[in-house]
Structures are given as structure tokens and as C-alpha cells.
Amino acid sequence: SWGRKGCTPVVRVRGRGSGRVSMAGLTCYKPGNRSRMFYSVREYRGRKGEPKGIGWRDLRDLLVRAHIQLGGPIVLVWDNLRMHLAEPMREFIADHADWLTVFQLPSYSPDLNPQEGIWSLVKRDVGNLAAADLGQITRAVRRRLKQIQYRPDLVDGCLTGTRLITDG
């Protein structure tokens, strides 16, 4: 923007600017099978009583959905997000130890987390969006995540980028 000398330009925008889009995801690998990615998206508009983001129940539901669709046990490698360490989440993990094993990544190691690569792909796409409202951002995020789900080569790239998984 520009303005006259000595006058600060003011850009008027629509909306309150008090919304956000939160994402949670699982990047899945099984030797001999194609890589998979599961996700959950939540929109927060600032309404009374509305959750501000993804909660432990959303993560629980995402894990259960992945377990059902994958049809087998899950070894989960997680970062140290506070929600991952919450007491109800730890209880859920303990109650489902027959199909769920969890390892924590070291602190401050996003380079070891393949899901960070997925988020980078989404943000690179959505970052260039001039959205009119929060709903448009949410739709763009969901659309990009759906595209990534159908591109196992992108998921593979995020997995091999961590060097935690190698082919052969």
C-alpha cells in the first residue's frame, strides 16, 4: 500500500480476524504397502463454548479411525506437543496398548517428524491464497490435504526426508 508523505496508510479488511484453522495428521508407513496419511481439520470462529483447536479427543478419534482403516497395530512416533502428553491421552494409550505403541521424538526435532513435511506442503499452497473468509481457507486446507492423500509419492518424500525410514 502507499500513502501521502507523513500519513500512515490504513488497509481496511473484512471480518474480525479472530478465526483459525487447526490440523492434526498421521503419516503412515508399512513395508510393502503404499504410504498413507490421515488428517483432521477444525475451524475456530470464536463462538462461545467452541473448542479453539484440535483436542485430545480429536487425536483419539483420528488414531481409532487410522487403526480401523489400516487394520492392524500402530506404532506412533510423536513430537512433544502438550496435547500428546495430556493425561487423558496417556490413559487412552495405556488402555489400547494391544494395538498402540508410542515413542516420543526428542524435543525440538521437527526434522524427524514426517508430518511436518506434510504441513509444509499445505502451508506452501495455502500461503499464497488471498482468502475472503475463514471458510475459504478451511476449504483450501482440506482440498490440499485430500490431494496429498492421493499422492503417496509426496507422503513417501516426507517420510524419507526424516531418514527414519529407508527403502531396502
Residue spans for each PLM region:
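Extended, low-complexity cationic-aromatic segments
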Residues: S1-D61, T162, T166
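RNase H-like polynucleotidyl transferase catalytic core
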Residues: K5-G15, A94-P114
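Short glycine-/polar-rich loops that comprise or flank the Walker A/P-loop
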Residues: G19-V21, G72, D98-T101
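Short beta-strand segments
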Residues: L26, I74-N80, F103-P106, L159
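Short, basic/hydrophobic alpha-helical segments
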Residues: W56-V75
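RNase H-like two-metal-ion nuclease catalytic core shared by retroviral integrases
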Residues: D79-N80, E87, F103-D125, G135-I137
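Short, aromatic/basic amphipathic alpha-helical patches
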Residues: A86-H96
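C-terminal anion-handling pockets and recognition modules
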Residues: Q115-G168
